[in-house]
Amino acid sequence: AGVECSRKTMYPDWLSLSGEGYVASMYKKYGKVVSPMGCRAFLSPWFERGGMHPADENDTPVFVGRFNIGAISLHLPMIYAKAKKESKDFYEVLDYYMELIRQLHIRTYDYLGEMKASVNPLAFCEGGFLGGHLGIHDKIKPILKSATASFGITALNELQEVYNGKSLVEDGQFAIEVMEYINKKVNEFKEEDGWLYALYGTPAENLCGLQVKQFRKKYGVVAHVSDKPYVSNSFHCHVSENISPIQKQDLEKRFWDLMNGGKIQYVKYPINYNKKAVETLLRRAMDMGFYEGVNLALSYCDDCGHQELDMDVCPKCGSKNLTKIDRMNGYLAYSRVKGDSRLAAHKMEEIKDRKSM
């Protein structure tokens, strides 16, 4: 029933508890599910007695009642371009911006920590959040210890392109090196500051357009980096890559275990509701430990009710009065309602380019 629903509606998304990686390991060891928040965010472990680390072998993690205080994203292609233009080491410039994000997160924790529990009695006084049994005049700082804060990354494909003119499909080695470096630094910051920092694959619904404008303003139009009105979200291959669903799963698996603060993997199914194909790819994704989305371009005619994948004109009645549903990044969204788009122009351009998204 689940596969049948996904192949017709693109929901539900699928979370592996039996495969590889962080989420499955929490379930296998503790019987705890790390449920995704929103379209892709995951909480880091917080243990009942030990906090950031287990007090002993019997200590168990808690995920219910916790939250994320926000994500701040690195503009990786721009950081690389800045380092090159100023003849600086890329990692030196990257360190500067990572430290900047770190200080912003610390400031956010400090600012929120001064708030009184009375600002949200249901969450902070009546047990809505973990530890939320404070008095109305108590400050909420103790509750924030179990809250995560994310270092986001976008445009990893464009970083690889600006580095050596190759995409993540063609190469990807530099991108892997950078992600390993960022992940290591985030973990160091976490231990030093005592806050639950995590690395997050930013969906960048609007940021993907803003970052292009920022890049062009300083460094102009660079082929395969800033020549489109959008950049790739998080660690995904470029949407225009003519690759198979299996190839896309394998290519993105390289980055999967480095981004435990937030991630989703999805492929486009050009298979016209082929249930067996969808099921096969979903089972493969579960074996690989993915949080997997099924991507179709769902369309239906508002005049005659005809449904079809990815139509712009109804073949039955000739109407352009269509409703279309596409995956925005992690969420589903109406790319057309009664013939008109509800998405930003840069996002609509990305949707037009999709072959393997």
Task: Indicate residue ranges for each PLM-predicted region.
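Conserved catalytic cores of very large enzyme subunits
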Residues: A1-K145, K166-L168, G172-R327, A333-S335
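Contiguous, well-ordered alpha-helical segments that form the cores/surfaces of helical PPI scaffolds
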Residues: A149-V162, E180
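Phosphate-handling catalytic cores of nucleic-acid transaction enzymes
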Residues: G318-K320, Y331, S335-K352
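Intrinsically disordered, low-complexity regions enriched in Pro/Ser/Thr
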Residues: R354-M357
